[in-house]
Each structure stands twice: as structure tokens, then as C-alpha cells.
Amino acid sequence: VATVSLPR
């Protein structure tokens, strides 16, 4: 699966 980086 691909992981996404969430903007803070």
C-alpha cells in the first residue's frame, strides 16, 4: 500500500 504524508 502507499502511504501519504499529511500536511500539518
From Swiss-Prot:
Q: Which UniProt keywords apply?
A: Allergen, Muscle protein
For whether the record's keyword set contains Lipid metabolism, the answer is no
Q: Which residues pair up as cystines?
A: none
Protein origin, superkingdom: Eukaryota
Additional remark text: The sarcoplasmic calcium-binding proteins are abundant in the muscle of arthropods, mollusks, annelids, and protochordates.
Outline what the protein does.
Like parvalbumins, SCPs seem to be more abundant in fast contracting muscles, but no functional relationship can be established from this distribution.
- Specify the protein name: Sarcoplasmic calcium-binding protein
Q: What is the lineage of its organism?
A: Eukaryota, Metazoa, Ecdysozoa, Arthropoda, Crustacea
